[in-house]
């Protein structure tokens, strides 16, 4: 039987990573967090003071840096950066890094490579449009900016990060704009993706809906 690819695309704070992890566990699929890869590159560039316009230096980084994912843990050059890649400074810069052409092309190749011959579920911005346009299940998971900001704000509160709801909402809207207007793989819904608005849905509601779609292609 051919391997199954499930693509969940959605804006920041739509709940796609939470949902993807649950479904991966439920179906025993490999979960690939494409956004975490961009976050790790963003972290490396920031910590090494590399300008986002310095394409030669960024290319060197892409050719030498080691990204590894083991379950819920993320490793950058063998160092656990799971917590660091969720920091406010990463949230504020990851969309800029993700809009750099050489970064996207390099990571798309890596995402395809690690997904090869496996049942996988990936979440991101361009999984169903660019990485795997032939994915058997494509979900476009959305929610209102206010609801997404509320979710992110609560995450920050749990981590005791000092930030206001209004700051989170502003950041969400800025990321939406950058993601949807960038030249390289802009964030758009795939023609054959199922749009699911999670604003007023529980996690279980969303998981059950997507699970039914997966059962149809098994």
Briefly describe each language-model feature range.
Residues 6-8:
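Hydrophobic anchor at the beta1->P-loop junction of P-loop NTPases
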Residues 16:
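Conserved lysine of the Walker
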Residues 61, 70-71, 111-118, 125, ...:
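Small-molecule kinase domains that catalyze NTP-dependent phosphoryl transfer to phosphate-bearing small molecules
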Residues 11:
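P-loop (Walker A) phosphate-binding loop of NTP-binding proteins
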Residues 85, 89-94, 98-159:
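ATP-dependent NMP and nucleoside kinases share a basic, alpha-helical "lid"
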Residues 26-88:
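N-terminal phosphate/diphosphate-binding loop that engages ATP/GTP or pyrophosphate donors
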Residues 19:
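Hydrophobic positions on the alpha1 helix immediately C-terminal to the Walker A/P-loop
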Residues 35, 78, 107, 121, ...:
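Residue-level signal for inorganic ion chemistry
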